[in-house]
Amino acid sequence: LLGVKLGDRFNNVLKLTKKHTKDHVLLFNDVHILMSSLGAKDHKTTDELLTTLQELAKAPCEDHELSLAPSLGLPLCQAFVEFENGNCDKAVDLLYPIRYQLIQLGGSNAQRDVFSQLLIHAALNSKSQAKQNLARCLLRERDVMRPNSPMTERLIRKAAAVHSMA
């Protein structure tokens, strides 16, 4: 998200996560496995994870975790895919409505923060003026929730610089 050069680090992570592509034990894990396959540019693993999760989401089940797949897990995963493919507007459309429900997926606040960062970056990079305005609102919200965050301050400056020239 921040443009940091990672080299082949995602390939190393994918070596560990790939074998869990079809596990679907925790949606939180699924999203992180997806991030590793997207980062490694492994389209086959990405498609396999999404396809098997979609199939499980269609089947009625009593598993609480999988019951969240249609409303939270799949839109979140798809938002990552859309962002990776340069479809920032679509990523915002998928992620913005569910942002406050993502706590149901588990993980710590810090671990879930990557989802907030994705939404902010997608909105910042959107072609839509309304979504760019949303990015600034999300950054103000983040600044209140995480005061004195250097990353938030950098993003606020970036938004001001990029969008004031548009």
What does each model-found stretch correspond to?
Residues 1, 13, 17, 34-36, ...:
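Generic structural hydrophobic/aromatic packing signal, biased to beta-strands
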Residues 26, 45, 66-67, 71, ...:
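Residues that mark the junctions of alpha-helical repeat units in TPR/alpha-solenoid scaffolds
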Residues 14-26, 51-68, 96-109, 137-148:
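Solenoid-like repeat scaffolds
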Residues 135-166:
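Eukaryotic acidic, Ser/Thr-rich intrinsically disordered low-complexity regions
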Residues 2-13, 38-56, 86-96, 130-135:
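Helix-turn-helix repeat elements of alpha-solenoid scaffolds
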Residues 1-9, 22-32, 47-77, 81:
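Amphipathic helix-loop-helix modules that constitute alpha-helical solenoid scaffolds
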Residues 57-77, 81, 86-122:
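Generic long, charged, amphipathic alpha-helical segments
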Residues 31-32, 36-39, 72-84, 114-125, ...:
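"A position-specific structural signal for the A-helix of alpha-solenoid helical repeats
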